[in-house]
Regions:
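Feature marking well-ordered beta-strand scaffolds used for ligand recognition
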Residues: 1-196
Length: 196
């Protein structure tokens, strides 16, 4: 692959690391809707990068009906001739309440051959499993949401990150511990894809 990507607070960058002792910055992108470029993840074959925006630092409700859909979201870029080409934003579709801190944070790729699937932590927004195989049209194919920690007061909590490991998804919940999930076949994901 010979590439590295970074989310650098104010922008996203792409490096050529063919020579690890002399990395070369080959592209940088910015997005007026992104407040804090937080993480960068390649798809399975290194042809796309998914960046997250931790708008508000993860401590405020940012997934309400009136919050912009491009803020606190994911930005998906294809890598075309060594350059980052913007394709789309994705933000969880289920609105959250005033007592739920919610914004894109950390996540990981679910390795399904021929597809680009990402499990995204949204703090108290729970987790989304996003199919971004079509970079311009990402879609949520599964989700889990525990609901607010407190119905009357904002308490910072929720999923810090979600990890795929040996057929399971691990959600590290700041207040309530760890949740472990198994994917089940659906119209969006076959048993063979899950087993791959």
């Amino acid at each position: 692959l010979g590439l590295a990507a970074g989310a650098c607070s104010g922008n996203g960058i792409l490096f050529d690391i063919t020579d690890p002792r002399a990395p070369e910055r080959i592209d940088a992108v910015s997005d007026s809707g992104f407040a804090y470029w937080h993480s960068a993840t390649f798809n399975n074959d290194g042809t796309k990068v998914l960046f997250t925006d931790e708008w508000g630092g993860g401590t405020r409700p940012r997934c309400r009906t009136y919050d912009p859909l491009t803020w606190g979201a994911d930005a998906i870029y294809d890598i075309v001739n060594g350059k980052l080409a913007f394709r789309s934003h994705f933000k969880m579709p289920a609105p959250q309440g005033e007592t739920e801190n919610c914004v894109a944070h950390n996540g990981s790729i679910i390795p399904v051959p021929g597809r680009d699937i990402f499990v995204q932590a949204w703090y108290q927004g729970g987790l989304s499993i996003i199919d971004f195989t079509d970079s311009a049209n990402p879609v949520e194919i599964a989700y889990f949401d525990r609901g607010p920690i407190d119905d009357t007061d904002l308490v910072t909590g929720g999923y810090w990150s979600t990890y795929w490991y040996q057929g399971r998804i691990y959600g590290t919940e700041i207040i309530r511990g760890i949740d472990v999930f198994a994917l089940t076949p659906s119209e969006h994901l076959s048993a063979n894809e899950i087993a791959a």
